[in-house]
Amino acid sequence: MLNLKPPPNLVQNAAPAPRPATTEQRAVNPANYALVRDRVQQRLLAELSPSATRDDTMEVRRVIEKLFAEVVADLGLPLSRTDRADIFDLVLADILGFGPLEVLLRDDNITEVLVNGPHHVFAEHKGKLVETEIKFRDNDDVMRVVERIVAPLGRRVDESSPMVDARLPDGSRVNVIIPPLALDGPSISIRKFPKHALSPDELIKKGAMTPGIAEFLKACVGARLNIVVSGGTGTGKTTVLNALSSFIPEDDRILTIEDAAELRLQQPHVVRLEARPANIEGKGHVSIRQLVVNALRMRPDRIVVGEVRSGEALDMLQAMNTGHDGSLTTVHSNSARDTLRRVETLVLMAGMDLPLRAIREQIASAFDLIVHLQRLSDGSRKIVQIAEVQSMEGDIIVMQDIFNFVQTGVDAGKVQGYFTATGVRPKFYEKLETAGMNIQPSTFMPTEPLRIRR
C-alpha cells in the first residue's frame, strides 16, 4: 500500500488520533468528529451559493469560514486548534474540491487516480500503481464527488446514463461508471493533466530515449515524415507526441484534433479542435472523424490527431496520402507491427467496403515511421522500437527496425538495458538529406551498449 497518508481531515471514515485532554483542549471522539463534520457540510451545502467553484478564492473561503464558525458554536463542542483546522480543510475540499481525492490531485508525483467503490482508492505514483489509505464513507459519498465533476459540464450520471467521460478544470481526463454497471460501487478513473509538457531533453534525462534518437526524430519531423506513436495505455504516447510536435517549424499552420485536449503546442499558428459528446438530449455529438474531414478544408500544413481509435483512421490515411505530409498521431497497440494490424481494423470501422490489400497499400504509402513505447516492469516508460514502414511485398507491409531498446535484466527493481541502432539505414534517408537534415550515416550503426539505469 502506498505510504501516502492523507492528513486526518482527508480520511473520510476515520477520526483524528486521540490527543491528551486538558482544561483547554480535549480529544474529539469519533462520534463528535462525525457530527461536526456532517453538520458543517449540511449547513454549507444549504447556504453556499451554487456558483461557488473549486478555485478557492478568498471571498468564497471567507464565506465558508463564517458559516463554519457558526456551526461549531451552535454545536457547543470544544475543538482543539488542530482539530478545528482539520475539519475546516475537509469541508473546504468537499465544497470547493473533490473531497478525499484532493490530496492526490494536488500531488505532482501522482499521475493517475482510480476509485473502485468507496473503500479502494489507487494511485499511480512514479510509474507504479499502488493502493492508498484514502477511503470514502459510502457510495453516496463517492457520488457527491462524481456530481462535483460532471455538474459544471452540463452532464449527468444516473441509472439511465451510467457512464460519462469528463474533464477537470485543470485538463485531467475523467471516466465515471456507476451501478448497476459497476457492481462494487461508483468507479472513477482520473488521468491527471501534467502541469507542463515534457521536452525532448527531459525525456532524455528520464531515460526514455537517447540524444541520438532525439536528433533522428527531430530530423524526421523536419523532413515532414508521417509518424505514428504507438503503445499501450499509460505508456506516454501523448507525452512523446507533444515532444515530437515541438520539432515542427514555427511558420507551419498546425491543426490539432483530440477527443480531450491534452496537447500543448507552443508554435504561434496552432488551431486546436476538440470532439464533443452528445448533450443530455443525445444531440450535438461531433466526432474525431468529422473534425479530421473538416480540418482538410482549413489549409493545414500539419495535422496532429491526439489518438486514432475508430473510423477516422481512414480519413487520416487519406490526408497523409493527399499532400498533408508531416502529420502525427497515436494508436493503441502492442508493437510496431501490431500498429499496422490495429490501423487495418480501425479503417474497417469506417464502414467502407475496402479490400484488405487496398487498405494495406494506403497504410504503406501513408506511414513513414512508427515510434513504439512501452511501460517496463519498474514503471519507467521508454521508446523501445522505432521502425520504418517501407513498402508492400505481395500482401505484406514490409517494415524495418531502425532503433531498439534491449533489456538485459533487472537489478534492485530497476530495468537494465541499452538503446542501439540496428545497423540499417532507412530508405527515407535521402529524403532527410533533401530536406537539409544533417544526420550522419554513423547514427544507424550499432554502438557499444549505453546502459540506462533510472
Residue ranges and their predicted role:
Residues 1-130:
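N-terminal anchoring/assembly modules that precede and organize ATP-driven motor systems
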Residues 237:
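Conserved lysine of the Walker
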Residues 379-454:
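NTP-binding/hydrolysis catalytic cores, primarily Walker-type P-loop NTPases
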